[in-house]
């Protein structure tokens, strides 16, 4: 599952919330954007994609909710390799809830809003609420070491996450 469509490539190459990025999109001033967008759905697909990227010298940029607070979605100007945006939003499941130990296992692509709603139905909370919570993903929170409005009660994301499975080159 991938796309080479211009609109998908453009969407995955900038964030949603800064006036600078909105301006650049509206006035066709983005410096560079992804060559392809891959939509991953599992850890196995992620491993295969990273292996292929290494083999063929491709630059991968992860994409979650697209909030881009850290400005990490735009390919670097000096990047000469093929750039692939890796969309994690299809990895958005709640895999398990351990009510006794107050633990939840989720996919990297689940948004804060969806996770909070699912946990609230069981009488729980995520305990993490960055300003971008409605759109941002758990994978994005972890990769950017996000802080949230409830940090004084629950801690930042590094205090909340107990176990992490991560695929790296």
Predicted regions and their residues:
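Noncatalytic alpha-helical scaffold of FAD-dependent oxidoreductases
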Residues: 1-169
